[in-house]
Each structure stands twice: as C-alpha cells, then as structure tokens.
Design a protein with these regions (language model features):
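Extended serine/threonine-enriched, polar tracts that run as long, contiguous segments within proteins
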Residues: 45-135
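Intrinsic disorder/low-structure terminal segments
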Residues: 3-6, 68-70, 75, 150-151, ...
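OB-fold ssDNA-binding interfaces and closely related basic DNA-contact patches used
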Residues: 1-63, 115-119, 165-170
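Eukaryotic intrinsically disordered, low-complexity regulatory regions
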Residues: 134-176
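Residue-level detector of solvent-exposed, low-hydrophobicity positions
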Residues: 11-14, 78, 159
Length: 176
C-alpha cells in the first residue's frame, strides 16, 4: 500500500494522508476530507514536507502464522519497484501471491540524476534458488492444502482491507 503522508516534524504524528485523489487532514476541528492533488500541487505540502509512504506487510516463514513484518519506506524507487513486482507476481501466479516463496532484496544503482552516487532500493524477487515455474507449482499446492484445511486467503485479505479503511490515520504511535 502506498500513499502520500505529511508528518508534523515535532511530534512525528501524521497531519495529512492522501492517495493522490483524496486525503484525510487533521485540523483543529478533527479529521477532514479534502482533494489530494499530489505533493507537487498541494499548498500544504510546499517545501517537500509531503512524501510518498509505502507499507508492505510480509508474512515471514518463521513468524506466527498470522503475524507479519511491515516494511515501511518513503523511497520512491522502492515503492515503484515493489508495486510493479507485486502486480507481476500476482498476475503470473494467477492470484496466488501469498503462497509464493518471495524475498526482499536490497539493490543499488547509480544514475546521472544521482550524480553517479549509488542509491539503494528494495526489490521483491523469488527466493534464491527458485525459478518462476517451480514457485507457481509450489504456490498451487500450498493454496490447495490451505483451502483443504479451511484457510481462505481471500477472506483474510478482505478483513485486512476493512481494518485499514476503519482507521482515520493508519500510522500508529509506533510508526511515527
């Protein structure tokens, strides 16, 4: 999930969170809904205070079955790369993204824009030693076994989306 966030630099609390279309802004009257024209066009965001903010919830093999690690980033390259990879793997696996053996990989690149200084971003790749054909075959088996045991990923995803939608500002105190 990626969106734009403007934080109060003194408290670390969110002041405005938007998706490029609409935003929720904290004012003296409470949380108000406004259009979100993106950081480049928003008068509140002048001076680079509003940044892209991405969160990727990842289930780790050794963690609790419903536990997750949350990768948070304000890096545009990481957000763009992760969004593209998630879409690719979701399409290639026929929607079995949660069953694929994936890993986060730190990559570096240098560009003319970065004056040849390396910039680092996170990529989503198949686990080392795994090819796409085998990963998809394994994902199908995992999905069938999970469903046979009564586990439905679609229902879990739906409930998670509902939970996100219920929060005025999703960023909790520990995330500020």
């Amino acid at each position: 999930r990626a969106e734009y966030s403007l934080f109060d630099r003194q408290t670390g609390r969110p002041m405005c969170i938007g998706n490029g279309e609409t935003c929720q802004r904290l004012t003296n009257q409470g949380v108000e809904h406004h259009p979100c024209p993106s950081p480049d066009l928003c008068p509140l965001a002048q001076g680079g205070a509003c940044k892209p903010f991405g969160r990727l919830h990842v289930n780790l093999d050794e963690s609790a079955e419903l536990g997750s690690f949350i990768f948070r980033t304000t890096g545009f390259n990481s957000i763009r790369t992760l969004a593209a990879r998630l879409a690719y793997y979701h399409a290639a696996s026929g929607g079995l993204l949660s069953c694929l053996p994936l890993q986060l990989t730190l990559r570096g690149k240098s560009t003319t824009q970065s004056y040849r200084t390396p910039i680092y971003y996170v990529d989503l790749t198949l686990r080392d030693g795994t090819n796409l054909k085998d990963a998809i075959s394994s994902a199908k088996q995992i999905d069938e076994q999970s469903k046979a045991a009564g586990f439905y990923q679609e229902a879990l995803d739906h409930v998670a989306r509902q939970g996100y939608g219920n929060a005025s500002f999703e960023v909790g105190g520990e995330e500020g």
